[in-house]
Amino acid sequence: MTDVTVKALAAERQVSVDRLVQQFADAGIRKSADDSVSAQEKQTLLAHLNREAGSGPDKLTLQRKTRSTLNIPGTGGKSKSVQIEVRKKRTFVKRDPQEAERLAAEEQAQREAEEQARREAEEQAKREAQQKAEREAAEQAKREAAEKAKREAAEKDKVSNQQTDDMTKTAQAEKARRENEAAELKRKAEEEARRKLEEEARRVAEEARRMAEENKWTATPEPVEDTSDYHVTTSQHARQAEDESDREVEGGRGRGRNAKAARPAKKGNKHAESKADREEARAAVRGGKGGKRKGSSLQQGFQKPVQAVNRDVVIGETITVGELANKMAVKGSQVIKAMMKLGAMATINQVIDQETAQLVAEEMGHKVILRRENELEEAVMSDRDTGAAAEPRAPVVTIMGHVDHGKTSLLDYIRSTKVASGEAGGITQHIGAYHVETDNGMITFLDTPGHAAFTSMRARGAQATDIVVLVVAADDGVMPQTIEAIQHAKAAGVPVVVAVNKIDKPEADPDRVKNELSQYGILPEEWGGESQFVHVSAKAGTGIDELLDAILLQAEVLELKAVRKGMASGAVIESFLDKGRGPVATVLVREGTLHKGDIVLCGFEYGRVRAMRNELGQEVLEAGPSIPVEILGLSGVPAAGDEVTVVRDEKKAREVALYRQGKFREVKLARQQKSKLENMFANMTEGEVHEVNIVLKADVQGSVEAISDSLLKLSTDEVKVKIIGSGVGGITETDATLAAASNAILVGFNVRADASARKVIESESLDLRYYSVIYNLIDEVKAAMSGMLSPELKQQIIGLAEVRDVFKSPKFGAIAGCMVTEGVVKRHNPIRVLRDNVVIYEGELESLRRFKDDVNEVRNGMECGIGVKNYNDVRAGDMIEVFEIIEIQRTIA
């Protein structure tokens, strides 16, 4: 055959040139349109195309559905029709011809090997039988020869000894008979052994033939999934209907093959089945109640443990006795017995500590693994950048003192701002944090309130500070909040610098201030103490530079240092909820550097720092030690005083925050339960108690705490203040709804209600009050509580009459003829009868007459007749005291 080009071959085969080139490429030949094609290459292409054309599906799956209706008789003679659908699936696999040939060859070889084994077994059995027959024939010949010799000897004895006794003959005959019986038994045993051997040989041959037939049927294609005994329902009637439908559809197909395949197995199973298998087969055929079959392959049983199992018991900080028993897989009574042996009595629901649980578990032979509840929290807090060198930092100075002693004004002059004039009432109502640059260095100031309601805020200020500047007015001296500030400073262990303010006033007396402070342990340096006293005037600016120098000198003595590099930590000075920015927290950084984007954990809250601002409202990207900043991005408003820590993983920060919330909730509930149990008897004995319900909203968290503490302290035995809800931010619709449901007063401190809340307030006619000064809020709540107090009853004597004589009246009984000696006697007023200045009766004046006329009152110096209600033992000389009850309205002190 001559070579042709690819293009000509494509025209001859009536295919495109590109397709032919692709087919050549698939066959492993690289060609272009103008290349020539040899005869060998054509043969290669043809073989490739034949292989592709001959490749078909190797597996064929057939699916069939059969539907039938089954009428099931029901109650009342009614029958119910049930639709039954039987789904069957058969898969046929196409065998490879080479694989089929290989399987046929293997099968032929196996059959030949089995036939050879069968022939060898038969020949072996024949040889053994022949050898056995020869042995038996030889033994038989020996026996016959012996018997013949015996008979000959017997005949000789009989001929020679004719005179032998008959008993000897009988004995010999008996002996011969026994020998014959023994020989017969031996022969039968040998025949039985030969028969068993032949049966064993036949059984081996039959088993080999059966296995060959099974292998023959296994080599043919069979369906992958056998659904012959599969039912879609458990009802006996439904299963019978399914089987009947299968028989109708299948017909006689496949029966002969299945019968042939099953016949040898059935024959072989007759000897191989055990008693348990036969019992299970009978149970499967017999079924149970309702026709349910039990699968023979589902064998299950419980074996009792023969030895104790030692477990690893994980124990938290607290655990109940029942939970401990579950962890050890024992009964609760056993744990209680073990505790009683150790000398501890407990119930199944009692909570025990970790140490007790460890002792009990180890006593019962288990291994204890102690787990701390705050393990994750400790791991998160300890995973920090450490090792950086500490550097000097600016001091944190807290301004403390009594209200109106000039703390904020003094700080104003230092910062050259006018913060005090902008505050409501001219008093500071939350902590202000500022840092100022001086000629000698930077100082961070914390301005705390001086009012008594802000004790907790002053305590937080003292804990976060390095130096306390105690401001005392020279004209006012030491006041209650001044003493409290001294106590906070001593409790925090920080040095105190005293600023004697208002020194420019004519009535200023600095020496008096020194004397009063010395009584509380604050001694000036000139008296041998450790406190610096500086005379200043916030109004005129006198002594400000000396105060700053004193602060920096004290800071230099303290040698304040902090790590500037690394993950930051600090404290929340103040927090509030801004309507546009969300939760805002004022944070004082103690060490490290706080960056924008850091993940912070703050008490119960967490979040990523989205923005940072300084006290001037300017955006900053980082804040070092002793720098106060406002941060945005927390999940909620944190509590003032909470520790702020930068962590690495936001997921772990969230887990720690949720754990803290849960723990706080548990402690709170436990405390409430304890107080309920302790006050149970008091609640049973006390009478009706009025409550003033308040929903409080304020601008910052510190104000919420201060106002709540002040209002709760106003509670008395008769009227109690109850804070139904409190929070930071404006008054919302939820707050108004809560107030309406609990009949509470809505109080807004430096916040206002939104539009939706105002609608609810108007529709429900709620009492809404706005305040900007805490004095006014407390005074009005006192007035509301005073209105709920029950009035005080006071007895006022209005008249006194002396009994001169007693006479009888058929209508009123004993009538006392009296002379009014003091005041006025009124009818129907309560009276007391006195005898020798001792009250002998207290009742009501029923009848009052003067000269037979009923009168309402009798004045001093007049005679009258008095009838006492339900009392007839009036004597001459008694005194009748007339009084009235006056209600006096009480107030909350």
UniProtKB/Swiss-Prot annotation:
Polar residues: compositionally biased ranges: 68-82
Annotated Basic and acidic residues bias: 93-159, 166-216, 270-283
Residues annotated as domain tr-type G: 392-561
Span list, region G1: 401-408
Binding site for GTP: 401-408, 447-451, 501-504
GO molecular function, one term: translation initiation factor activity
Cellular compartments per GO CC: cytosol
InterPro entries, alphabetized: DNA-bd_dom_put_sf, EF-G-like_DII, EFTu-like_2, IF2_assoc_dom_bac, IF2_II, IF2_N, P-loop_NTPase, Small_GTP-bd
Subcellular localization(s) per the UniProt record: Cytoplasm
Keyword list, A-Z: Cytoplasm, GTP-binding, Initiation factor, Nucleotide-binding, Protein biosynthesis
Residue span of region G5: 537-539
Region (G4): 501-504
Region ranges (Disordered): 49-303
Pfam family, one: GTP_EFTU
Biased composition (Basic residues): 254-269
Sequence segments annotated as region (G3): 447-450
Location of the region described as G2 in the Swiss-Prot/TrEMBL record: 426-430
Top-level division of the source organism's lineage: Bacteria
Gene3D superfamilies: P-loop containing nucleotide triphosphate hydrolases (3.40.50.300), Putative DNA-binding domain, N-terminal subdomain of bacterial translation initiation factor IF2 (3.30.56.50), Translation factors (2.40.30.10), Translation initiation factor IF- 2, domain 3 (3.40.50.10050)
Known function: One of the essential components for the initiation of protein synthesis. Protects formylmethionyl-tRNA from spontaneous hydrolysis and promotes its binding to the 30S ribosomal subunits. Also involved in the hydrolysis of GTP during the formation of the 70S ribosomal complex.
HAMAP family referenced in this protein's UniProt entry, alphabetically: IF_2_B
Family: Belongs to the TRAFAC class translation factor GTPase superfamily. Classic translation factor GTPase family. IF-2 subfamily.
PANTHER family reported in the protein's UniProt record: TR-TYPE G DOMAIN-CONTAINING PROTEIN, TRANSLATION INITIATION FACTOR IF-2-RELATED
Name of the protein described by the UniProt record: Translation initiation factor IF-2
Organism this protein belongs to: Salmonella arizonae (strain ATCC BAA-731 / CDC346-86 / RSK2980)
